Amino acid sequence: MAVSLWQQCIGRLQDELSAQQFSMWIRPLQAEMDGETLVLYAPNRFVLDWVRDKYLNTINQFFTEQMGSDAPKLRFDIGSRPASKPAAPAASTKSPVAPAAKSPSKPSFNSNEPAATANHRSNMNPTYQFDNFVEGKSNQLGKAAALQVSENPGGAYNPLFLYGGTGLGKTHLLHAVGNGIIKNNPNAKVVYMHSERFVQDMVKALQNNAIEEFKRYYRSVDALFIDDIQFFANKDRSQEEFFHTFNALLEGNHQVILTSDRYPKEIDGVEDRLKSRFGWGLTVAIEPPELETRVAILMRKAQESGINLPDEVAFFIAKRLRSNVRELEGALNRVIANANFTGRPITIDFVREALRDLLALQEKLVTIDNIQKTVAEYYKIKMADMLSKRRSRSVARPRQMAMALSKELTNQSLPEIGDAFGGRDHTTVLHACRKIAQLREESHDIKEDYANLIRTLSS
């Protein structure tokens, strides 16, 4: 009875949550009765803690509404019940799911598979591991999903689609997943490549009349990771071959991970049937790192290089370079090289001198005025509305977005930002920043708008 009601509870959660939230947190759960207690199994500690913190009250409320005082007790555990089935229903009204043949409970990596698997030499970069991936709010979900895939390839998150701007850590996560899979099963055939390599291989196969060998190779892998899938755009034959390869891999419970610089539905020149399949599993945004994460990245990189980086220097760099991890690491490498060549200590003045061209470019590009104009154009409102007292949502929300971006992308104080928005109080700016942060958690559209504007302003 309780397990049956759990399926109904899943239906309610699916209606209330976004497709990404449902796929990320609810779909992987498995339910089993233990006496009078309903046990919900989560695949890892991260999912368990998140569900218990965010959704426990909703779940308890549903059971109380349905069963009153007879509602079962709830307990959370890590793992899976024997011969389990996924907690979520086989079909979803919010987003399509993979064919029924794809069962997350069946491992697709078998050490007894053909010799071709065992003889395959992995092209995973061993330096990219989960341990040296700096986690923050901007990439927390992406790392959690990638970690789950490495522990249970071919499971609930298949395919996994990671999207975000250049240099944010998508490739790092791909290699970390591959290294994790191979660590658990050295015989696994895991292939990583850029999308252009797939196209090149297919062209060579056509030229050499070896298209059947091409198909056999790509459909025999245990996991296929393709970076920058957007480069398939307008390559019709490549899309056709990848479509059939994708279907074959998922039907065989083999893991697929794809990355792109944009949300799947926004990739122009890619067939709708492929975009639809990209959303079968889980789609996660990797956003530019927030200040605390940028500082942590710099401190970790300096530590790995054997350099003592003062906290105030790390904050100085992190506050001024915001677009991506690659830019941060490149700037730090330049600082370290200059310090080694000159023998000078790394201070704020030294960093200001070593990075003067880079810092000057950043300060020139991102101003509050530039942010206001960009946001106004994005939301199709008048620039004057940014400074007006109008409170309609069509104006207030873009204004709040511009305030939040001003705090994130400039070095101006809250009072200075308020002055630039028609003389508003600093508490108004603080409220706007908190409101946008909340909406980014709750609304996919706001999250997308924020990421798109960050990319535009940082490019």
From Swiss-Prot:
PROSITE patterns for the chain: DNAA
GO (cellular component) term, any one: cytoplasm
Region Domain II: start-end pairs: 91-122
Binding site for ATP: G167, G169, K170, T171
InterPro entries referenced in this protein's UniProt entry, alphabetically: AAA+_ATPase, Chromosome_initiator_DnaA, Chromosome_initiator_DnaA-like, Chromosome_initiator_DnaA_CS, DnaA_C, DnaA_dom, DnaA_N_dom, DnaA_N_sf
Start and end residues of each stretch annotated as Disordered: 75-124
Tree of life domain: Bacteria
Record keywords, A-Z: ATP-binding, Cytoplasm, DNA replication, DNA-binding, Lipid-binding, Nucleotide-binding
Biased composition regions of type Polar residues, renumbered to the chain: 109-124
Region (Domain I, interacts with DnaA modulators): 1-90
Gene Ontology molecular-function annotations: ATP binding; ATP hydrolysis activity; DNA replication origin binding; lipid binding
Residue numbers spanned by region Domain III, AAA+ region: 123-339
Biological process according to GO: DNA replication initiation; regulation of DNA replication
Subcellular location: Cytoplasm
Residue ranges with Low complexity bias: 80-108
Region (Domain IV, binds dsDNA): 340-459
Domain-related comment: Domain I is involved in oligomerization and binding regulators, domain II is flexibile and of varying length in different bacteria, domain III forms the AAA+ region, while domain IV binds dsDNA.
Family of the protein in this entry: Belongs to the DnaA family.
Subunit structure comment from the entry: Oligomerizes as a right-handed, spiral filament on DNA at oriC.
Function: Plays an essential role in the initiation and regulation of chromosomal replication. ATP-DnaA binds to the origin of replication (oriC) to initiate formation of the DNA replication initiation complex once per cell cycle. Binds the DnaA box (a 9 base pair repeat at the origin) and separates the double-stranded (ds)DNA. Forms a right-handed helical filament on oriC DNA; dsDNA binds to the exterior of the filament while single-stranded (ss)DNA is stabiized in the filament's interior.
This protein's name: Chromosomal replication initiator protein DnaA
Organism: Shewanella loihica (strain ATCC BAA-1088 / PV-4)
